[in-house]
Protein backbone atom coordinates (compact mmCIF):
# COMPACT_ATOMS: atom_id res chain seq x y z
CA UNK A 1 0.00 0.00 0.00
CA UNK A 2 2.85 2.39 0.85
CA UNK A 3 4.52 1.73 -2.52
CA UNK A 4 1.26 2.57 -4.26
CA UNK A 5 0.94 5.90 -2.42
CA UNK A 6 4.55 6.84 -3.19
CA UNK A 7 4.08 6.00 -6.88
CA UNK A 8 0.86 8.03 -6.95
CA UNK A 9 2.61 11.01 -5.33
CA UNK A 10 5.48 10.86 -7.85
CA UNK A 11 3.05 10.69 -10.79
CA UNK A 12 1.04 13.64 -9.43
CA UNK A 13 4.24 15.70 -9.07
CA UNK A 14 5.29 14.89 -12.63
CA UNK A 15 1.84 15.75 -13.97
CA UNK A 16 1.91 19.17 -12.29
CA UNK A 17 5.43 19.95 -13.52
CA UNK A 18 4.58 19.01 -17.13
CA UNK A 19 1.31 20.95 -17.07
CA UNK A 20 3.14 24.25 -16.56
CA UNK A 21 4.08 24.71 -20.20
CA UNK A 22 6.48 27.39 -21.27
CA UNK A 23 5.61 29.05 -24.54
CA UNK A 24 6.16 31.98 -26.85
CA UNK A 25 3.51 34.70 -26.64
CA UNK A 26 2.32 36.61 -29.70
CA UNK A 27 1.84 40.14 -28.37
CA UNK A 28 0.79 41.90 -31.57
CA UNK A 29 0.25 41.08 -35.23
CA UNK A 30 -1.00 42.99 -38.24
CA UNK A 31 -2.51 39.84 -39.78
CA UNK A 32 -5.49 38.40 -37.90
CA UNK A 33 -5.63 34.62 -37.63
CA UNK A 34 -7.02 33.01 -40.74
CA UNK A 35 -6.54 36.10 -42.94
CA UNK A 36 -3.11 35.28 -44.37
CA UNK A 37 -3.05 36.15 -48.09
CA UNK A 38 0.40 34.76 -48.89
CA UNK A 39 2.54 31.85 -47.83
CA UNK A 40 2.47 30.62 -44.23
CA UNK A 41 5.66 29.41 -42.55
CA UNK A 42 5.93 25.88 -41.21
CA UNK A 43 8.69 23.52 -40.11
CA UNK A 44 11.25 23.01 -42.87
CA UNK A 45 10.54 26.35 -44.59
CA UNK A 46 13.33 28.83 -45.28
CA UNK A 47 12.30 32.19 -43.83
CA UNK A 48 13.81 35.62 -44.34
CA UNK A 49 12.90 38.37 -41.87
CA UNK A 50 13.87 41.74 -40.47
CA UNK A 51 13.89 41.96 -36.69
CA UNK A 52 14.51 44.05 -33.61
CA UNK A 53 15.43 42.19 -30.39
CA UNK A 54 14.65 44.04 -27.14
CA UNK A 55 14.57 43.59 -23.40
CA UNK A 56 11.41 44.28 -21.38
CA UNK A 57 12.49 47.89 -20.75
CA UNK A 58 12.76 48.51 -24.52
CA UNK A 59 16.56 48.41 -24.75
CA UNK A 60 17.58 47.02 -28.15
CA UNK A 61 20.21 44.26 -27.95
CA UNK A 62 20.17 43.18 -31.62
CA UNK A 63 18.50 44.10 -34.89
CA UNK A 64 18.73 43.79 -38.65
CA UNK A 65 19.81 47.45 -38.80
CA UNK A 66 22.84 46.73 -36.60
CA UNK A 67 23.89 44.14 -39.20
CA UNK A 68 23.66 46.50 -42.18
CA UNK A 69 19.90 46.29 -42.70
CA UNK A 70 20.11 42.83 -44.20
CA UNK A 71 17.36 40.34 -43.51
CA UNK A 72 18.05 37.37 -41.25
CA UNK A 73 17.55 33.95 -42.83
CA UNK A 74 17.09 30.49 -41.32
CA UNK A 75 15.25 27.23 -41.86
CA UNK A 76 12.55 26.56 -39.27
CA UNK A 77 13.31 23.35 -37.40
CA UNK A 78 17.07 23.19 -38.06
CA UNK A 79 17.81 24.51 -34.55
CA UNK A 80 20.30 27.11 -35.79
CA UNK A 81 18.52 29.89 -33.85
CA UNK A 82 17.07 30.06 -30.35
CA UNK A 83 14.03 27.77 -29.96
CA UNK A 84 11.69 30.65 -29.12
CA UNK A 85 12.39 32.37 -32.44
CA UNK A 86 11.58 29.20 -34.39
CA UNK A 87 8.37 28.68 -32.40
CA UNK A 88 7.42 32.34 -32.81
CA UNK A 89 7.68 32.16 -36.61
CA UNK A 90 5.58 29.03 -37.13
CA UNK A 91 2.36 29.98 -38.98
CA UNK A 92 3.60 33.52 -39.62
CA UNK A 93 2.52 34.95 -43.00
CA UNK A 94 4.70 36.38 -45.73
CA UNK A 95 4.75 40.17 -45.20
CA UNK A 96 3.35 39.90 -41.65
CA UNK A 97 4.61 42.08 -38.82
CA UNK A 98 4.51 40.33 -35.46
CA UNK A 99 5.74 41.11 -31.92
CA UNK A 100 6.57 38.14 -29.70
CA UNK A 101 7.73 37.53 -26.14
CA UNK A 102 10.17 34.65 -25.64
CA UNK A 103 10.68 33.33 -22.09
CA UNK A 104 14.30 32.91 -21.04
CA UNK A 105 13.94 29.09 -21.09
CA UNK A 106 13.42 29.25 -24.87
CA UNK A 107 15.94 32.07 -25.39
CA UNK A 108 19.37 32.26 -23.77
CA UNK A 109 18.59 30.28 -20.62
CA UNK A 110 19.72 30.49 -17.04
CA UNK A 111 23.14 32.00 -17.83
CA UNK A 112 22.35 34.41 -20.67
CA UNK A 113 25.28 35.69 -22.74
CA UNK A 114 28.08 37.51 -20.98
CA UNK A 115 28.03 41.28 -21.66
CA UNK A 116 24.98 40.94 -23.94
CA UNK A 117 22.00 39.09 -22.42
CA UNK A 118 21.57 39.02 -18.61
CA UNK A 119 20.82 35.67 -16.94
CA UNK A 120 17.17 34.52 -16.89
CA UNK A 121 15.99 37.34 -19.16
CA UNK A 122 12.83 37.15 -21.23
CA UNK A 123 13.32 38.81 -24.62
CA UNK A 124 11.03 40.49 -27.12
CA UNK A 125 11.21 40.52 -30.91
CA UNK A 126 9.51 42.71 -33.49
CA UNK A 127 9.51 40.64 -36.68
CA UNK A 128 8.71 41.49 -40.30
CA UNK A 129 8.68 38.59 -42.74
CA UNK A 130 10.39 39.39 -46.04
CA UNK A 131 9.92 36.01 -47.71
CA UNK A 132 9.09 32.35 -47.09
CA UNK A 133 10.36 29.56 -49.31
CA UNK A 134 8.70 26.18 -48.92
CA UNK A 135 10.72 23.18 -47.88
CA UNK A 136 11.94 21.05 -50.79
CA UNK A 137 10.02 17.83 -51.27
CA UNK A 138 11.79 14.81 -49.78
CA UNK A 139 11.70 11.36 -51.32
CA UNK A 140 9.21 9.03 -49.61
CA UNK A 141 11.91 6.75 -48.20
CA UNK A 142 13.47 9.74 -46.35
CA UNK A 143 10.17 10.21 -44.54
CA UNK A 144 10.37 6.62 -43.26
CA UNK A 145 13.69 7.21 -41.48
CA UNK A 146 12.95 7.85 -37.80
CA UNK A 147 14.28 10.98 -36.15
CA UNK A 148 16.65 10.89 -33.20
CA UNK A 149 13.75 11.85 -30.93
CA UNK A 150 11.69 8.89 -32.14
CA UNK A 151 14.58 6.48 -31.59
CA UNK A 152 15.13 7.83 -28.07
CA UNK A 153 11.39 7.56 -27.29
CA UNK A 154 11.24 3.92 -28.40
CA UNK A 155 14.44 3.13 -26.46
CA UNK A 156 12.92 4.63 -23.32
CA UNK A 157 9.72 2.65 -23.87
CA UNK A 158 11.70 -0.60 -24.24
CA UNK A 159 13.66 0.21 -21.07
CA UNK A 160 10.44 0.89 -19.19
CA UNK A 161 8.96 -2.44 -20.31
CA UNK A 162 12.09 -4.31 -19.19
CA UNK A 163 11.96 -2.49 -15.83
CA UNK A 164 8.30 -3.41 -15.30
CA UNK A 165 9.01 -7.07 -16.14
CA UNK A 166 11.91 -7.08 -13.67
CA UNK A 167 9.77 -5.59 -10.90
CA UNK A 168 6.96 -8.08 -11.53
CA UNK A 169 9.37 -11.03 -11.35
CA UNK A 170 11.26 -9.65 -8.36
CA UNK A 171 8.16 -8.80 -6.32
CA UNK A 172 5.41 -11.31 -7.17
CA UNK A 173 1.86 -10.76 -5.97
CA UNK A 174 1.74 -12.53 -2.59
CA UNK A 175 -2.03 -13.03 -2.59
CA UNK A 176 -1.80 -15.44 -5.56
CA UNK A 177 1.33 -17.35 -4.51
CA UNK A 178 -0.24 -19.27 -1.55
CA UNK A 179 -3.20 -20.83 -3.40
CA UNK A 180 -3.31 -24.66 -3.59
CA UNK A 181 -3.11 -26.30 -6.99
CA UNK A 182 -6.50 -27.06 -8.53
CA UNK A 183 -7.66 -30.66 -8.58
CA UNK A 184 -7.37 -32.89 -5.49
CA UNK A 185 -8.30 -31.29 -2.19
CA UNK A 186 -5.45 -30.80 0.22
CA UNK A 187 -5.28 -33.45 2.98
CA UNK A 188 -5.33 -32.23 6.52
CA UNK A 189 -4.50 -34.22 9.61
CA UNK A 190 -7.58 -35.12 11.55
CA UNK A 191 -7.43 -34.99 15.31
CA UNK A 192 -7.19 -38.46 16.94
CA UNK A 193 -10.31 -39.52 18.71
CA UNK A 194 -10.05 -41.87 21.71
Curated annotation (Swiss-Prot):
Name of protein: FK506-binding protein 3
Family per similarity comment: Belongs to the FKBP-type PPIase family.
Alphabetical list of InterPro entries matching this protein: FKBP2/11 (IPR044609), PPIase_dom_sf (IPR046357), PPIase_FKBP_dom (IPR001179)
Ranges of biased composition (kind: Basic residues): 184-194
EC number: 5.2.1.8
Catalysis: reaction(s): [protein]-peptidylproline (omega=180) = [protein]-peptidylproline (omega=0)
GO molecular function terms attached to this record: peptidyl-prolyl cis-trans isomerase activity
Region of interest (Disordered), residue spans: 173-194
Subcellular locations according to the entry: Membrane
Signal peptide: 1-19
